[in-house]
């Protein structure tokens, strides 16, 4: 793998986890360019279907283009088949597109999560098009080792929504304390069969206060 590709993947922390009735996707907001903080309000979670979201790590331009492409493909799927696309099918579409471009790869590492008739699920998708269904927790980016330490220690099957949001916030806070590529705030999305919701800043601050206590 080219050295410049490895360097482009060093920033960001993203987290995905399954709870009773849905999925949490969460990221921090820092975007870096080498040693410079290029943005303090970078968007790293995109809604690609009614009940499916995607997190991004890697090159911003590549990731934004992929978000546009997969959103259109998910809409076309619904129009052609008269039903919502599943999380697995959305991950497969993304995987196929990335694999077709493997000789000129998109510099990204992605999480695709949501809920469908099969229940809640999260997939990790790499730049070569490899897609893996994660059973419960997953993290990507340079801060993922710190995030995994918290997730592995505190995650339990059957967590409720409030507990899952707090765990995601706690994992990201741990990564932001030690990883230079992560910081500037937290963005959390909750996806259930009834809604796709961006968690409010007030709620995130409440959970952050619990992690400090």
From Swiss-Prot:
GO terms for cellular component: cytoplasm; proteasome core complex, beta-subunit complex. CDD domains: proteasome_beta_archeal. InterPro entries: Ntn_hydrolases_N, Pept_T1A_Psome_bsu_arc, Pept_T1A_subB, Proteasome_bsu_CS, Proteasome_sua/b, Proteasome_suB-type. Belongs to the peptidase T1B family. NCBIfam families: arc_protsome_B. The 20S proteasome core is composed of 14 alpha and 14 beta subunits that assemble into four stacked heptameric rings, resulting in a barrel-shaped structure. The two inner rings, each composed of seven catalytic beta subunits, are sandwiched by two outer rings, each composed of seven alpha subunits. The catalytic chamber with the active sites is on the inside of the barrel. Has a gated structure, the ends of the cylinder being occluded by the N-termini of the alpha-subunits. Is capped at one or both ends by the proteasome regulatory ATPase, PAN. Component of the proteasome core, a large protease complex with broad specificity involved in protein degradation. This is Proteasome subunit beta.
